[in-house]
A protein has these predicted regions:
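C-terminal, non-catalytic "cap/extension" segments appended to globular domains
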Residues: 3-12, 20-126
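Active-site region of the double-stranded beta-helix
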Residues: 16
């Protein structure tokens, strides 16, 4: 595949990444707030709590007439409790490191324009 305008391709990729993180941040809010509420009161209707969080943070409506333990589809709750927000923390940390590399190694270049290919200074900085 030949890219006709590499700059437009880079800009589109950057926008897609930004949108993906915005959507993911809302999903992380659902998981974090659901788990917090679940541990505060494990006797409550957890499906209601789940859909309350989904509606509030993702803007999705619960299916009419559905009353199944949809929260159970997220196995993270059992296998790695109170962990899901770490995915977002990792994204935030990676973004901060990248911005710092752009500032320190690439003399203040905009982070969207920086790549690490053939740049040993990045390794030295790290």
């Amino acid at each position: 595949m030949k890219v006709v305008d590499p700059q437009a391709f880079d800009e589109t990729g950057t926008k897609m990444s930004q949108y993906r993180l915005l959507v993911f941040s809302r999903w992380c809010q659902v998981m974090l707030r659901f788990e917090k509420g679940m541990y505060e009161n494990p006797e409550q209707d957890l499906n209601k709590l789940w859909w309350d969080m989904v509606e509030k943070y993702q803007g999705l409506r619960r299916p009419a007439g559905r009353n199944a333990p949809d929260y159970g589809a997220k196995y993270h709750i059992v296998g790695a409790p109170v962990y899901y927000h770490n995915y977002m923390m990792g994204q935030l940390f990676a973004s901060q490191v990248h911005a710092t590399i752009a500032k320190e190694v690439y003399s203040g270049a905009h982070p969207d324009t920086v790549t690490y290919v053939n740049e040993p200074k990045v390794g030295e900085f790290m």
